[in-house]
């Protein structure tokens, strides 16, 4: 005869298996988000080769088996970190890209304003999320490994801006022969700016922020400011030169 104090087997709580998160952790994405946040910081500082799953688990305060429950391999976690920063970047920049696309056919001051807003929005985003710069710089140290990350999380956004510039050129509102190089020049300059901020003193940071934004405005105004299309200038274009695109981005 079973004692009244005993709990019937079918009413006992199920035991938590090894590596499974606790019930409180299963109720929301907090553990996964903490893993991604800490992993992004470590990958940005050390690169994937210098970061182990054990390092990440220790930063989060869980064991490796619990980390494996969310990400079965380091490659999956590394990819998810890029997906996370890309989602944040797209959320910040998508409205600005849409404004640029609408202004492409108009040209003049609306296009110049949209370009400046997009460039400054990109710089603002990187300053607020510097790990984005260092995550990508670590990736680009090896030009061939991880090219799939570029295709998934960098080239689509670059391509949208390139196509907007190409549409503006085809509409005759700007003269643009090298949108591919123009976009990447701004991207690399912005990442270099964030790198300079990381090593600067407070006073140097203020100067860097001011001068870099001033340079961005001068760069864009020189290429795409009002009247540039009529003047025949813009990204190295000469009178009668055609728009040249060697490879458009899908």
What spans do the regions from the language model cover?
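Helix-turn-helix
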Residues: 31-34, 38, 42-76, 80
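Hydrophobic alpha-helical connector segments
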Residues: 80, 94-129, 180-186
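C-terminal peripheral helix-coil segments that are non-catalytic and often amphipathic
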Residues: 2-18, 124, 128, 158-171, ...
